[in-house]
Amino acid sequence: MTSMIPETKITAVRNTLQITFGVNEFEDIRQLTAGLSSALIFRIVVLGKPYLLRVITRTDEISNPSHYYSCMKPAAEAGLAPHIWYAGIEDRISITDFIEAKTFPVSVARMKMPGVLKRLHSLSPFPYRVNFFDFVDGLVRKFQDTKILPGNMTEDLFHLHAKISSVYPRNIQDMVSCHNDLKPENIVFDGDRPWLVDWEAAFLNDRYMDLAIVGNFVVKNDQEEKEYLTNYFDEDVNEYQHARFFLMSQVLHMSYFTFLLLQVSAGNKPVELNSAIPDFREFHDQMWAGKITLENNEARQEYALVHMQQLRHNLNTKRFEESLYIVSNY
């Protein structure tokens, strides 16, 4: 069964098991392939109990888990992430509790996730890495330079994004500890409560980023948005908070759209524009149900275009202009 572990990591994994559990073999192993992490993820059984084994095979500095662990550990101590049994920086191996995933109804997630996010955002500040707006602005410039799509298809979107970028607050004192990658496979529901996993993208960020990511999956109309944000803030939500949420949602659409198409184009695959673009809500419902993953370029391209279509729709609504006005005059 150790054949699943890269030969260069077998000794380190055995040492980890010995240090952690007093044995040097596991009883069962199964590789988990959901998600886009470059690390190898396994469900292992040791002394009759399942655990999650994460093995980072890359040796470059960008794969150094120091930052990842510095965010995961306080989250685990707060009961937001699974218990950590081992987290080695030099060997780049970690072992945590394995949470058996149960179906997480969207209606239940809409009620439970705001409280989880509020607890996450109340943790001591994670390390600062980058301003998310600066990151997205960089994606836009790179996208324009590579000319992945004709300019007449995207020029209006980039122009309107610039309007958001010019008015949206970037006050670092207002930033909180964020996960930044709360897609369905990183939210594991055990039948009672959700656990947050895969902390590679965590850093100090705008709270509305996490709220918008989860909102893509659980908020379907204005009333649900009101309930969702009210549950997070524990008070009636004002027009400024609604406007911040809406504008950050558009920035999120832009980031997915540009990042994923840049990723697809890096493989020298032309963007297919003749196929019908799926409905935003239906696509996210399928992702939430685990029926769609982003493991291949076809799915990533489709998801990018889903976000582009939704972004175009939202930027042409009355709410967009109202939100710009509210935030710029707050």
Segments and roles (model prediction):
Residues 208-240, 250-269, 280-293, 299, ...:
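Active-site activation/catalytic loop segments of kinase-like enzymes and analogous catalytic loops
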Residues 23-33:
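Short secondary-structure junctions
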Residues 92-95, 182, 218:
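Short glycine- and hydrophobic/aromatic-rich loop-to-beta-strand nucleating segment
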Residues 31-135, 140-155, 170:
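ATP-binding pocket architecture of kinase catalytic cores
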Residues 6-25, 125-180, 190, 226, ...:
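An alpha-helical support segment within catalytic cores of ATP-dependent transferases
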Residues 58, 101, 194, 202-204, ...:
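Activation segment
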Residues 21, 79, 117-125, 168, ...:
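A general structural signal marking secondary-structure boundaries and capping sites
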Residues 38-48, 52-53, 162-211, 223:
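Active-site acidic catalytic loop and adjacent metal/ATP-binding pocket
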